[in-house]
């Protein structure tokens, strides 16, 4: 049904049409809602949750603006943490207070929350504010929010509502619900610019959090290369599965596979114990003091790590050979090993192999899987394609995700737009058609969706392209020429570890190059920005480039990268006043944050300031509403002519 038919069916009379025109044109003049951007969460659920709850620091900013000089800094901090963590902070209040002190706390807190809610809701319609409220408290909250308690006729009414909330033991529930409403209204739309998965301990909880938030909130995702592995795993790609299991072993996260997603690792553990011993190159990274393991567990993970890595290297061979268009023959590493596995020849140089573990590799046929290895990968594919929870999470990533997003004049993408040294777009030639620039992204996304819809087809081009997205030389999500996983395990010479970044990463400092990218994706080069994740911003490197047109927001949610970045992540805020880049300190623990009121915002930096406040009319949603207004005005004219 086209827009005209849809609207004329919904609004059939002159008063109905006129009322809707008035409503829409009023909305168009409201201030632009706030967007928040974050990337490279990598399973760090608690840090991610903290940023969601504090709205990238926006909640505290709202409190400061609302109450100005009425609160000391300590009082403001306590109130802010009540809004962030209402249930946990109220539990602490109940331990500290009772009787009249608790009653007074309730009365003071109710007044403050209503004031803050009113302040936060000013740029939204009543309808939108209502949708952000907990359904069970909508009536009570609206009565408190929209009634003037200073009016004598309403004063008793107002205070009776508050007293009854306390007497009927609903005060804690109302406070929690109102704090959550404030959180939702503080940031209207969240963009996750890739890499929810891998390294950290709880990517599943990050996805569950986004699912919950999306029920009343606006969320989108631009897939990262690590996310692709998990989507590919659910789609039945043996290579994606081997890679993500290897990474899970490397970061001591196999419990995510077994306990969260129900993936059967018994066959793999049995194979690993049979063929592999201890090996320092494959010992799991112990980045987290809160997740200790026994020596027996460490040995088992080390063995599993080796077993799945060998399966991965073997699986790569047939795909590279059947897809010459991928141009990846240089990654056929197993056949470059000496027959005794003591050395390997790469790019004309011979390197000594260290910590080798090639017991299952036949020098005469290096990519051939042992029957036991084939059994392992078949079992894993079966488990991944039949995991109900994994598919529910990947369905969400598919429904809310894309390779890139054009949103409110900005381009959001995780990795890069592949180019050569001169900035010319490069890509892939598939079946005689060359795809570069935006067409490359669109082709790869179409194939990803096709592969996901056909999990029993796992040797087709669409499935192979999912693996290419992870590691291919011209993959927009990888952005390097080589993924030197093999070399990093077995060769100590750093020369062999070089992966070779795409020229995009040094060209993106040039404003003219960014304008070219924006034009390629049909965005206004003069006002648009590119918002990028994927590459951690090292200490001393500016995340804002190209005269403020390129903004990189991977600052180190992932704990292993915090040594490189020196911070705990970036988020970007875009509201009616302009754009701000928020720098976060490393997150410690949720318990520390709640007990010690430890926030993680360190600095805010203005990226761009609007000459005047932007309105809804200047957003993508505003364009849609303006189209509706035009259709309704046309229909209004038709009805008046009929009269």
Curated annotation (Swiss-Prot):
Q: Which organism is it from?
A: Lacticaseibacillus paracasei (strain ATCC 334 / BCRC 17002 / CCUG 31169 / CIP 107868 / KCTC 3260 / NRRL B-441) (Lactobacillus paracasei)
Spell out the InterPro entries in the cross-references.
FBPtase_class3, Metallo-depent_PP-like
What keywords does the record list, in alphabetical order?
Carbohydrate metabolism, Hydrolase, Manganese
**One biological process GO term for this chain?**
gluconeogenesis
What's its top-level EC category?
hydrolase
Catalytic activity annotated for this protein? beta-D-fructose 1,6-bisphosphate + H2O = beta-D-fructose 6-phosphate + phosphate
Q: Which gene codes for it?
A: fbp
Q: Which co-factors does it depend on?
A: Mn(2+)
Its Enzyme Commission number(s) read 3.1.3.11
Supply the SUPFAM superfamilies for this chain.
Metallo-dependent phosphatases (SSF56300)
Query: What is a single molecular function from GO for this protein?
Result: fructose 1,6-bisphosphate 1-phosphatase activity
Cite the annotated pathway. Carbohydrate biosynthesis; gluconeogenesis
- Record's protein name: Fructose-1,6-bisphosphatase class 3
């Amino acid at each position: 049904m086209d827009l005209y038919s849809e609207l004329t069916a919904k609004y059939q009379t002159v008063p109905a049409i006129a009322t809707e025109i008035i409503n829409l044109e009023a909305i168009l003049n409201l201030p632009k809602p706030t967007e928040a951007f974050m990337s490279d969460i990598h399973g760090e659920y608690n840090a991610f949750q903290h940023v969601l709850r504090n709205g990238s620091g926006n909640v505290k900013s709202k409190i400061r603006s609302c109450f100005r000089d009425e609160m000391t800094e300590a009082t403001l901090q306590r109130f802010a943490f009540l809004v962030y963590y209402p249930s946990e902070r109220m539990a602490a209040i109940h331990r500290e207070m009772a009787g009249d002190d608790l009653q007074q706390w309730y009365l003071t807190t109710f007044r403050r929350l209503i004031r803050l809610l009113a302040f936060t809701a000013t740029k939204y319609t009543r309808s939108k504010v209502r949708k952000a409220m907990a359904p069970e408290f909508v009536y009570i909250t609206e009565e408190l929010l929209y009634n003037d308690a200073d009016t004598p006729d309403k004063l008793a009414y107002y205070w009776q509502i508050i007293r009854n909330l306390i007497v009927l033991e609903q005060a804690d529930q109302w406070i929690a619900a109102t704090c959550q409403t404030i959180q939702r209204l503080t940031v209207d739309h969240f963009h996750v610019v890739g890499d929810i998965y891998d390294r950290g301990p709880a990517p599943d909880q990050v996805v569950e959090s986004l699912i919950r938030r999306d029920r009343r909130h606006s969320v989108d995702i631009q897939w990262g290369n690590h996310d692709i592995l998990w989507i590919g795993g659910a789609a039945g790609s043996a290579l994606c599965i081997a890679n993500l299991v290897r990474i899970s072993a490397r970061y001591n996260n196999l419990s995510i596979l077994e306990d969260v997603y129900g993936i059967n690792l018994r066959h793999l553990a049995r194979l690993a114990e049979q063929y592999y011993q201890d090996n320092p190159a494959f010992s799991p990274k112990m980045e987290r003091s809160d997740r200790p393991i026994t020596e027996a567990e460490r040995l088992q993970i080390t063995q599993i790590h080796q077993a799945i890595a060998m399966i991965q290297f073997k699986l790569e061979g047939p795909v590279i050979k059947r897809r010459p268009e991928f141009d990846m023959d240089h990654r056929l590493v197993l056949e470059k090993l000496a027959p005794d596995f003591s050395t390997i020849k790469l790019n004309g140089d011979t390197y000594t192999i260290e910590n080798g573990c090639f017991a299952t590799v036949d020098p005469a046929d290096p990519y051939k899987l042992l029957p036991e290895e084939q059994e392992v990968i078949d079992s894993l594919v079966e488990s991944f394609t039949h995991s109900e929870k994994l598919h529910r999470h990947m369905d969400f990533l598919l429904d809310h995700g894309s390779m890139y997003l054009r949103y409110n004049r900005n381009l959001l993408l995780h990795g890069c737009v592949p180019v050569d040294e001169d900035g010319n777009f490069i890509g892939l030639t598939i079946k005689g058609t060359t795809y570069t620039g935006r067409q490359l992204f669109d082709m790869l996304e179409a194939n990803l969706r096709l592969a996901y819809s056909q999990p029993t087809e796992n040797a087709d081009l669409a499935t192979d392209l999912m693996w290419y997205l992870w590691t291919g030389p011209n993959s927009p999500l990888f952005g390097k020429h080589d993924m030197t996983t093999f070399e990093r395990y077995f060769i100590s010479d750093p020369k062999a570890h070089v992966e070779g970044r795409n020229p995009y990463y040094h060209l993106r400092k040039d404003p003219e190059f960014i304008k070219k990218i924006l034009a390629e994706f049909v965005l206004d080069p003069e006002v648009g920005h590119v918002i990028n994740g994927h590459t951690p911003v090292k200490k001393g490197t500016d995340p804002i480039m190209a005269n403020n047109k390129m903004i990189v927001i991977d600052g180190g949610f992932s704990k292993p990268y915090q040594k490189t970045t020196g911070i705990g992540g970036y988020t970007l805020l875009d509201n009616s006043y302009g754009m701000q880049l928020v720098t976060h300190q490393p997150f410690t623990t949720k318990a520390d944050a709640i007990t010690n009121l430890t926030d993680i915002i360190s600095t805010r930096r203005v990226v761009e300031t609007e000459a005047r406040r932007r309105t809804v009319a200047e957003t993508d949603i505003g364009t849609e509403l303006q189209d509706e207004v035009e259709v309704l005005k046309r229909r209004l004219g038709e009805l008046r002519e009929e009269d």
